[in-house]
Amino acid sequence: MAKDNEAIAINDAVHKLQLYMLENTTDQNQLFAARKLMSRSDYEDVVTERAIAKLCGYTLCQRFLPSDVSRRGKYRISLKDHKVYDLQETSKFCSAGCLIDSKTFSGSLQEARTLEFDSVKLNEILDLFGDSLEVKGSLDVNKDLDLSKLMIKENFGVRGEELSLEKWMGPSNAVEGYVPFDRSKSSNDSKATTQSNQEKHEMDFTSTVIMPDVNSVSKLPPQTKQASTVVESVDGKGKTVLKEQTVVPPTKKVSRFRREKEKEKKTFGVDGMGCAQEKTTVLPRKILSFCNEIEKDFKNFGFDEMGLASSAMMSDGYGVEYSVSKQPQCSMEDSLSCKLKGDLQTLDGKNTLSGSSSGSNTKGSKTKPEKSRKKIISVEYHANSYEDGEEILAAESYERHKAQDVCSSSEIVTKSCLKISGSKKLSRSVTWADQNDGRGDLCEVRNNDNAAGPSLSSNDIEDVNSLSRLALAEALATALSQAAEAVSSGNSDASDATAKAGIILLPSTHQLDEEVTEEHSEEEMTEEEPTLLKWPNKPGIPDSDLFDRDQSWFDGPPEGFNLTLSNFAVMWDSLFGWVSSSSLAYIYGKEESAHEEFLLVNGKEYPRRIIMVDGLSSEIKQTIAGCLARALPRVVTHLRLPIAISELEKGLGSLLETMSLTGAVPSFRVKEWLVIVLLFLDALSVSRIPRIAPYISNRDKILEGSGIGNEEYETMKDILLPLGRVPQFATRSGA
């Protein structure tokens, strides 16, 4: 036990000496005193740590290591001394003198530490370094290692409940101990506020559609109040009481036609269409059953609970506009007290419509007034908790007639595009009346036809009109509700939503004319583009067959697509563009004038030679000639050709003169240029330089270095030698 304690004390003392030597500079006496305790490995550790700290490894030196340390190698061989020096060892010292002194001191140290040492001498050595350690005969290991200070504390406040992961490990969004503000309470408050706002404005959705001019959907909360006079019946005898009622109309978009109409109304005091008379009639209780039937019909229109208001314009000779709005429903407590209230206002009278006929004769003939009419039925539901009252249906209708003898104006009425010019013109008048008014039935229909025909009863006409209008309103409301839900949910945009709902938006004729003119201009530009190109396309490929929009299946590349050709594909494409009919004539020993014989060889088309203007072809030829000249000597060496390089260069230059050099020079490597030179020499060996033909078979070394196989080489060779090496026995001209 005593030996173990002494060993621990010695190791602790050596560690303190190492720390002192690392941080401070020692003197000669301290260094020799430390030699009694430290081993050679302990000192080497000190040298390494000092070198890492950019200090000289020798403890007696105070200088720093040089910054420009040579990193040429790990060892250096000295031919003068016949020795090998470790450069990593010399890099730990500032000079050769410190290296020698450190190695001398390290050689004087013992290999291992001594474990038997007197405690008195140990304290004397430590005193030299400014630190004393009282070493006793029986050392307390627990005290020296501070083990006696360890304490174990038990947490008795742990509850039996399970803690969440966030409470146990802390918040997941904490950054370096920062705990963010707890937003759970504020988020709950905001959610409650949002829900309350949604409950308030849940019914404030208004949709307005006018076909075929404008399609608009607006969702805006009402912010303005408008005071409207409601004519309310007190008893069934026709007495009326005027009562002010505050109505909150929803905000909706207004088309350009409506804005012009409102402007004319403010200017002339009329509705812009010649209607200035107004007559109000109050219905008694006797028509409540009819009102209930109308209410059921409008409930079947497909309007949702959001208060969808829809308007439709028909062009069947006369116009009918539906405008239905629904106010927010009452709460559940006042549901029994909710009553349907409304007004029936009939705008009747001989209203005039001014305008000139769109079908006027250009030769000076008199314009014939065209009869047209428009009927607007407005049904409004008021679900408010008022006192017990009557259920009143509010309906408005006005008639507009175009009469030249009543009123004249410069206003032009748009003619329906679906109406045939030679069709029979109808004039129908629908009047809503009271039974006590003495004017006949509840609904009176008068038909004024230009030609006599079979007359229908009022009930039949009403059934036909109601069925067509109900079908139109139901289909329109269903389509609009689907489109509005799709747009409000964010699943699709307006165009996709209308397409899915079955609504087709047709552009105006002016827009179509602009698109047609743009297409014609684009076609003219595409026809003129080939004459403006400075770099022509590949020879042998007509320009009209490439990427035709109407007759081609080519499409733009997808995103991230990168087309990379192999070395063989790039070489084959280059040779295919270079070789012309003049090249084949030169290869097979013919004159330049005989190049027309090689325009079509074995079904392959070889175009005429193309020379670019502005000297671009000559520049391309010089670039290719330089690349061939650098690769030619290596090919001659591999093939062992017994011929001068100058003669080969002359033949290659003559071959380049016959080629169509129109595109940029491909970025071939040296190994690929070797294959190009080999192909050209193989072509010249047919008739121009036949002496090198036996040596072409030594091509394996060149092909192996470039990665081109024999089959690929033969494929490229077929471009230069389509008739083979013996042209007199080969088929020609497609035969």
UniProtKB/Swiss-Prot annotation:
Residue ranges of the TM segments: none
Annotated stretches, region: Disordered: 179-201, 349-374, 519-538
Biased composition (Low complexity): 349-364
Zinc fingers, RTR1-type class: 33-118
Record field: compositional bias (Acidic residues): 519-530
Catalytic activity entry: O-phospho-L-seryl-[protein] + H2O = L-seryl-[protein] + phosphate; O-phospho-L-threonyl-[protein] + H2O = L-threonyl-[protein] + phosphate
One CC-aspect GO term: nucleus
EC nos: 3.1.3.16
UniProt subcellular location: Nucleus
InterPro entries membership: Rtr1/RPAP2 (IPR039693), Rtr1/RPAP2_dom (IPR007308), Rtr1/RPAP2_sf (IPR038534)
A GO MF term: zinc ion binding
Residues involved in Zn(2+) binding: C56, C61, C94, C98
Record keywords, A-Z: Hydrolase, Metal-binding, Nucleus, Protein phosphatase, Zinc, Zinc-finger
Main location class: nucleus
Pfam families linked: RPAP2_Rtr1
UniProt-listed GO biological process terms: cell differentiation
Family classification: Belongs to the RPAP2 family.
Role this protein plays: Putative RNA polymerase II subunit B1 C-terminal domain (CTD) phosphatase involved in RNA polymerase II transcription regulation.
Name of the featured protein: Putative RNA polymerase II subunit B1 CTD phosphatase RPAP2 homolog
High-level lineage: Eukaryota, Viridiplantae, Streptophyta, Embryophyta, Tracheophyta
